[in-house]
Amino acid sequence: MINDGVAKAMKVNSMWIDMSTSVPEAALNVKANLNQSVAMIDAPVAGMSVGADKGTLSIFAGGNASDLERAKPLFDIMGDPSKFFKCGEWGTGYAVKLVLNMLWFNQFVASVEALMLGVKAGVDLETLRKALVGSPCQSIMLERDLMGLLNDGDYDEGFAVALACKDLKLAGDLARNVGVPMEVHATVENIYRRARARYGDRAGEMIPAKLYEDDTNTLLRIK
């Protein structure tokens, strides 16, 4: 829309709100192409389609403080007001979303790897999961996010592995731009790339678990 004339046609004092997942540099590029009277906010979200339907999304907003206040009534309708985060200037909303996605993928792979290790060592899967939930390793991943996979073999096709790989690449790009070494991220990204190559772009975001299952001939399923 930046290049097809929409930006130049925006009215004075209107707002450009981008809710996609991108890199901070994208916000600066958009702002540079907007009329100075047009406000720019980057406001990616978390909560998936369920959060969108229920109006309970988490929103991570970057932009001028006055612009964020002006847009907040809209955000309060779309998301949970207690989960509206003013992240800083332009691009910081994008940065928070990339960090969130990267950490979720890291936690997912680490959790699957840990569970597979315990199961192959002879521990009952549900006993192992409950032991971890009741330990300092407790996490939403072990309590909630993995349950569709462990109970039903659901690799979560609601978010494709191709999109997961895109987000991991963007997180890596951000890390290189700001000079942060990301060795764990690099390993997780490689695992996701291998899963994408083996199972296809449309496989779900939890498909890396199938790499472990196929390579060990062991399903991670609660009996």
What are these regions (language model features)?
Residues 2, 21-101, 105:
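Rossmann-fold dinucleotide-binding core
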Residues 3, 14, 27, 168, ...:
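Short amphipathic alpha-helical/adjacent loop interface patches that line ligand
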Residues 6-12, 77-78:
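Short, conserved loop/helix-junction motifs that constitute active-site signature segments
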Residues 10-14, 36-38:
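A short helix->loop->beta-strand "cap" motif at the edges of active sites that frequently abuts
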Residues 13-14, 30, 221-222:
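Mobile acidic interaction elements
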Residues 92-215:
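Helical "substrate-binding/catalytic lid" subdomain
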Residues 215-223:
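Hydrophobic alpha-helical segments
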